[in-house]
């Protein structure tokens, strides 16, 4: 497997990506110290879609409320055995179709930048579950202690492409107990969820958070995320920030009990938006761009 190693030209920060394993970020180190949650590792991600590192959640992030959705009057069914479809413990489709997907093509690779492309139009198995021909280009740049991930969706043909994707960076503050980590968020709108993790339709305003993680757990959805919003986790003199720079108006915060990880997930639309609507499109001739960065 080809592993791409990116090095910050001005700092001892190194990132590694595996394009042929789903264009997943597998490592981010500062002076050799790992800052990404490895969980069960890359092998489990490839074998069973068990997320780790910085996986791509595409074409939808988080879960869908059922195995079908409608776009522009066209109803699409997700067959239980369809390529790439994985489900959560409640049987709901989870995190899109691209876990471990090998069809990414590396376009450019340098000491601190990687660009890879996925042609949805070239894969009938992907089109069966997401019938919107398009190109997805992901460019990763490492500079000034920041990993910047820029995604561009370009429609091919005359069908607009729903934008419901996201990323799932697993962050950790090494050598500091989880209970002592401090998390920070901007003002957000908290989406209330049901027992299956789906929005109920109710929401409440949430003021900015600055608090110790303690023994708390999160699996919470948000929208109205302002452009440029900063989420952070810190401890022991170390601070890791996730910047929602462009194109990510929704978020999920995930901090499971018993795991030394916290996730601030940039999302182009809230959970289950592909079924409920309210998302944006990449229209023909008008590529859509979304950018987030992780600063260490």
Language model segments and positions:
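Short, Gly/Pro- and small/polar-rich lid/capping loops
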Residues: 1-11
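Short Pro-Gly-centered flexible turn/kink motifs
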Residues: 69-78, 151, 281-296
């Amino acid at each position: 497997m080809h592993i791409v190693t990116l090095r910050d030209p001005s700092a001892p920060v190194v990132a590694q990506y595996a394009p042929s394993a789903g264009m997943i970020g597998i490592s981010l180190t500062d002076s050799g110290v790992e800052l990404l949650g490895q969980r069960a590792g890359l092998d489990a991600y490839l074998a069973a879609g068990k997320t780790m590192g910085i996986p791509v959640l595409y074409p939808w992030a988080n879960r869908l409320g059922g195995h079908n959705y409608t776009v522009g009057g066209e109803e699409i069914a997700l067959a239980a055995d369809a390529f790439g479809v994985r489900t959560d413990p409640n049987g709901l489709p989870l995190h899109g179709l691209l876990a471990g997907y090998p069809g990414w093509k590396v376009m450019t690779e340098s000491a601190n930048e990687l660009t890879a492309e996925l042609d949805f139009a070239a894969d009938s198995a992907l089109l069966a579950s997401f019938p919107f021909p398009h190109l997805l280009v992901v460019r990763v740049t490492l500079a000034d202690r920041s990993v910047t991930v820029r995604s561009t969706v370009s429609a091919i043909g005359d069908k607009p492409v729903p934008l419901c994707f996201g990323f799932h960076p697993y962050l950790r503050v090494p050598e500091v107990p989880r209970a002592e980590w401090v998390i920070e968020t901007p003002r957000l709108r908290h989406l209330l969820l049901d027992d299956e993790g789906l929005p109920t339709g109710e929401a409440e305003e949430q003021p900015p958070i600055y608090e110790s993680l303690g023994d708390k757990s999160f699996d919470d959805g948000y929208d109205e995320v302002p452009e440029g919003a900063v989420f952070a986790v810190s401890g022991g003199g170390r601070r890791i920030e996730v910047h929602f720079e462009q194109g990510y108006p929704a978020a999920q915060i995930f901090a499971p009990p018993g795991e030394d990880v916290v996730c601030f997930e940039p999302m182009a639309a809230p959970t289950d938006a592909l079924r409920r609507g309210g998302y944006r499109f990449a229209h023909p001739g008008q590529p859509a761009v979304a950018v987030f960065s992780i600063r260490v």
